[in-house]
């Protein structure tokens, strides 16, 4: 699929700074005809076709209706080359990250399946479909100020300076190849825990007054420590943590009617090397719940203006070569069933769910979610830099640290 998206009448200059950050990352490898951070979501479904219609026919009409309801899904792909023949009843959504985030993807699919689950083929007539209002950018939805306020600008500069220093300098996994090795194919390695194991993790976290995400985060930190030297470990482990900002937005932007937009921020917590498992997880749980502030929301215009400027600035000609970052970003989708219900009347149910993104750098992303009471950990990476053996070993160590830290026995399915 072509990686460049052309929206008639909407040049790059009409994207907000926040949206341009995601757009810039998406297009970073366009010279190789590859897209970075392209979202893919795969759902296996079981369905009884209404009125004898085929699944593909009904799906096509349901998608047309969804596009009318969510105008942000409309696009003209440039360089569309691949076709995916239907082998089984799986629904695959490919979409750009600057257009939607992980939870928004779940919300869109939930609405698509809701349409599909109806007893009659859904109407696509414009006069019978009520489109949602266009969704503004994150900055606008949050009510951020564009005023040249010295305090807001100072807050924004401090936030971005700290973010870049902590995110860029963080150590990560050892990768194969060197700084000139081009990316290849996106891959993933998943661990699907049993229902009993998932419940054991949740019970242990509840007992220790920590979140499941914080426990996974701590296990990930200890896994990365296991690949570093003793000296490298002393700085602790800092990773970029994706944060869902939808609960912080005012109505109506915190609703499913505004699913087709990216509402995500990033924080950079540090896990100290010498702290205990539960101690680290409690500290992370507290940071997850306390980092947000009204000043952050009010400063968003300036935060992403400075962020975009730093990302776009050329490196000084005399600067020493920078080691490509190879950190592991953590992103928790939480309980997917809250946004993708899984059951849609007697005609349709979603049996399996998987989410991921295309990765073109040496960085990797660990996604965590529960669906139908099972916890899944999915490591997304590029196979030019990591073998499947390496990915499997990383995930095995994460699971092992979860077992030891929470004192539970875990089984995968």
From Swiss-Prot:
The segment annotated Disordered runs over 123-145
Q: Where is the composition biased (Polar residues)?
A: 123-138
Query: According to the record, what induces this protein's expression?
Result: Expression is positively regulated by the azaterrilone A cluster-specific transcription factor tazR.
Pathway per the UniProt entry: Secondary metabolite biosynthesis
Membrane-traversing stretches: none
Kindly state which keywords UniProt assigns to this record, in alphabetical order: Transcription, Transcription regulation
The role this protein plays is: Part of the gene cluster that mediates the biosynthesis of azaterrilone A and other azaphilones, a class of fungal metabolites characterized by a highly oxygenated pyrano-quinone bicyclic core and exhibiting a broad range of bioactivities. The first step of the pathway begins with the non-reducing polyketide synthase tazA that assembles one acetyl-CoA starter unit, five malonyl-CoA units, and catalyzes a series of Claisen condensations, methylation, PT-mediated cyclization, and finally releases the first hexaketide precursor through the R-domain.
The record's PANTHER family line, in alphabetical order, gives:
CHROMOSOME 7, WHOLE GENOME SHOTGUN SEQUENCE-RELATED, CONDENSATION DOMAIN-CONTAINING PROTEIN
Stated name of the protein: Azaphilone biosynthesis cluster protein M
Species of origin reads: Aspergillus terreus (strain NIH 2624 / FGSC A1156)
Gene that this polypeptide is encoded by: tazM
């Amino acid at each position: 699929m072509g990686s460049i998206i052309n929206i008639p009448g909407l040049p790059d200059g009409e994207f907000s700074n926040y949206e341009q950050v995601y757009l810039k990352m998406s297009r970073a490898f366009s010279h190789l005809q590859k897209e970075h951070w392209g979202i893919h979501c795969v759902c296996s479904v079981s369905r009884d076709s209404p009125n004898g219609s085929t699944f593909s026919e009904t799906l096509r009409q349901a998608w047309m209706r969804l596009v009318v309801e969510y105008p942000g899904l409309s696009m003209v792909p440039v360089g569309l080359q691949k076709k995916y023949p239907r082998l089984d009843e799986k629904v695959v959504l490919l979409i750009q990250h600057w257009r939607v985030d992980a939870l928004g993807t779940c919300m869109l699919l939930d609405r698509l399946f809701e349409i599909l689950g109806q007893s009659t083929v859904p109407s696509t007539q414009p006069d019978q479909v009520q489109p949602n209002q266009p969704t503004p950018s994150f900055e606008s939805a949050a009510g951020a100020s564009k005023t040249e306020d010295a305090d807001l600008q100072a807050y924004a500069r401090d936030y971005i300076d700290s973010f870049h220093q902590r995110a860029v300098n963080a150590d990560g996994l050892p990768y194969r190849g060197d700084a000139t090795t081009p990316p290849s194919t996106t891959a993933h390695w998943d661990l699907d825990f049993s229902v009993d194991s998932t419940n054991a993790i949740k019970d242990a976290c509840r007992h220790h007054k920590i979140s499941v995400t914080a426990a996974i985060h701590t296990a990930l930190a200890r896994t990365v420590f296991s690949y570093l030297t003793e000296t490298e470990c002393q700085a602790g482990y800092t990773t970029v943590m994706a944060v869902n900002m939808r609960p912080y937005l005012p109505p109506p932007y915190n609703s499913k009617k505004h699913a087709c937009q990216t509402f995500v921020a990033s924080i950079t917590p540090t896990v100290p090397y010498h702290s205990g498992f539960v101690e680290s997880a409690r500290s992370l749980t507290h940071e997850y719940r306390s980092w947000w502030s009204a000043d952050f929301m009010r400063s968003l215009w300036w935060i992403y203006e400075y962020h975009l400027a730093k990302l776009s600035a050329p490196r000084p000609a005399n600067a020493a070569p920078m080691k490509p970052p190879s950190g592991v970003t953590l992103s928790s989708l939480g309980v997917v069933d809250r946004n993708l219900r899984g059951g849609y009347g007697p005609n349709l149910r979603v049996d399996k769910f998987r989410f991921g993104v295309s990765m073109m750098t040496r960085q990797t992303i660990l996604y965590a979610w529960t669906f139908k009471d099972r916890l899944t950990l999915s490591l997304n990476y590029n196979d030019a830099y990591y073998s499947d053996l390496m990915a499997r070993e990383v995930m095995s160590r994460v699971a092992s640290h979860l077992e030891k830290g929470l004192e539970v026995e875990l089984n995968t399915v």
